[in-house]
Amino acid sequence: MRVISLKTLKDYWKAESAAEAELRAWYAEAKNAAWKTPADIKAKYRDASILKAGRVVFNICGNKYRLVVWINFKAGIVYIRFVGTHKQYDKIDAETI
């Protein structure tokens, strides 16, 4: 998959160093993945939440952080829409961000 944008993740882990290792691991896995359907994601990330319109929420560091992405399965592109703490996540609408 093509992940847009690594810079978003880097900026976040510079501010929240506790999230760095797991965000780096997620990025490496996503970059090497070939997800064609939401079921492909659930096979690897059982605790991921599949939302409407291609949105997926990943739990990072045991759900301390949340990563929201929009996936264009046909094009093989993952767009990072949000990364933040669970508390910050509770203040957004993951289906529209």
Task: For each feature predicted by the language model, list its residue ranges.
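Basic, Lys/Arg-enriched alpha-helical interface segments
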Residues: 1-64, 72-79, 86-97
